[in-house]
Amino acid sequence: MAKVVLKAPDGPPSDVERIKRESRYLRGTLAETMEDPISAGIPDDDNRLMKFHGSYLQDDRDVRTERQKQKLEPAYQFMIRVRTPGGVATPEQWLVMDEIARKYANGTLKLTTRQAFQLHGVLKWNVKKTMQAINGALMTTLAACGDVNRNVMCNPNPYQSEVHAEVYEWAKLLSDHLLPKTRAYYEIWLDDEKVAGTPQVDGEEEPIYGPTYLPRKFKIGIAVPPSNDVDVFSQDIGLIAIVEDGKLAGFNVAIGGGMGMTHGDKTTYPQLAKVIGFCTPDQVVEVAEKIMTVQRDYGNRSVRKNARFKYTIDRLGLEVVKEEIERRLGWKLGEARPYHFEHNGDRYGWVEGVNGTWHFTLYVEGGRVKDDDDYKLMTGLREIAKVHTGDFRLTANQNLVIANVTSEKKAEIEALIAKYGLTDGKRYTALRRNSLACVALPTCGLAMAEAERYLPKLLDKIEEIIDENGLRDEEITIRMTGCPNGCARHVLAEIAFVGKAVGKYNMYLGAAFNGTRLGKLYRENIGEEEILRELRVLLARYAKERLDGEHFGDFVIRAGIVKEVTDGTNFHD
């Protein structure tokens, strides 16, 4: 297939655009709908708006068929996402989230791939109380979902250096500046009260977004080389911190990343952001705003599957988009500066910071904080939060850093880690430590197959092959998503599985270990037996034929197993 050439949007605006336009800045009839006692669900128009408030209406798909037989409405429930720039939460905030999860949700916390909290299983009657409790802890769900700028990501441990701390401050500034200004959120959930300490939001109009906000979601992430833990090239705006003489000189600016696609539609594809220049720290907020307004004005509002910024850039041309950004800025971006990425994973266990504090990175399988019969992760973290004087940092790989532990507190924290058996993951294979999975079934309405619930079981079987080939400590990234939307940034994993139907997956190989190259479709619509058969051959070859220091993703390309993807527009070649 030739390189994809996208048509200009020439149809009428999609129905979602009507909903936004008529919503009176995200109000709609949400206030009335949420008070309606007749149904546990809400109408579709309001559900579209609900996303901007940080929540999705879902249902328990495990019982959907049975409820249909009984002529009952679906087991409706809400997912609520908490916006935490850079993934930072205080111990007090952690304890509030823990309490909310047990009181109003399904008793678990999900740490997301965008460094946010998710609550699942919240019933309609408890949504407002949940929102109020979250805001009472000086957090918000506003713009955690929807056609707006989402949670701003950055390296999760700002106290590794002064640069990390500074980058985190810029992530917070970007997050606050690009937050919607509507009062609707406060009117509906907080009875129009402003909570002290939360970002200032006031005014009736949206000076940046306008009445219809953006054509689709928008994502920003900041990476600090050599770590690409935020997968900076998957972002609509990827900012690469440039450090010179130990100081933050500024950011290389990359635009147009995105992982989502639609099965069978070759006009949709994942894409990596491309570097267009450099800006200084004091310019970065203005640069991000102007980039976002280009997408606001030129993005496809007719066909939502082609509405992300990556498609706008590929349709108009990178240079055209760059020129328009610079026209709006009134000045030209600087020349991009050298940088180098080594990996996109986390560093586990204890790490000493530059200021005498300690940080413990905890492995959290699937990002799910819960208590099982034999592993009391949720209880252990609750007890740590009660005595911890530093903070918690959610990583982009669904793990958790117990950060800024003082020397005086370290022994106490270590004792609690030991008491509850909390793990840094080092007893697992490196493959498992480098795994990611989205939520998928039973709550996600888009999921075509399992992900979070299934990947650990599949890994049990893959690890047998890993051990047979002496690869237990070999760092290989593996990710699974229940659909092709890419919440777990699937095609940036060296081995990736994308749900096609229940028990069936498309298998991708060949992404770069450092997140700088997309994977390629290797096998389509395969089940567990074929997955294991393929991996048995591939991993055996890798163990025998790899070069010194060669990563698995590089090996499968060099060996001719898959073709290298050089750009998203030829992803389907």
UniProtKB/Swiss-Prot annotation:
Catalysed reaction equations from the record: hydrogen sulfide + 3 NADP(+) + 3 H2O = sulfite + 3 NADPH + 4 H(+)
UniProt-listed GO biological process terms: cysteine biosynthetic process; hydrogen sulfide biosynthetic process; sulfate assimilation
Cofactor, how bound (note): Binds 1 siroheme per subunit. Binds 1 [4Fe-4S] cluster per subunit.
Binding-site residues, [4Fe-4S] cluster: C438, C444, C483, C487
Listed InterPro entries: CysI, NiRdtase/SiRdtase_haem-b_fer, Nit/Sulf_reduc_fer-like_dom_sf, NO2/SO3_Rdtase_4Fe4S_dom, NO2/SO3_Rdtase_4Fe4S_prot, NO2/SO3_Rdtase_4Fe4S_sf, NO2/SO3_Rdtase_FeS/sirohaem_BS
Function noted in UniProt: Component of the sulfite reductase complex that catalyzes the 6-electron reduction of sulfite to sulfide. This is one of several activities required for the biosynthesis of L-cysteine from sulfate.
Quaternary assembly: Alpha(8)-beta(8). The alpha component is a flavoprotein, the beta component is a hemoprotein.
Name listed for the protein in its UniProt record: Sulfite reductase [NADPH] hemoprotein beta-component
Organism: Geobacillus thermodenitrificans (strain NG80-2)
Gene name of the encoded protein: cysI
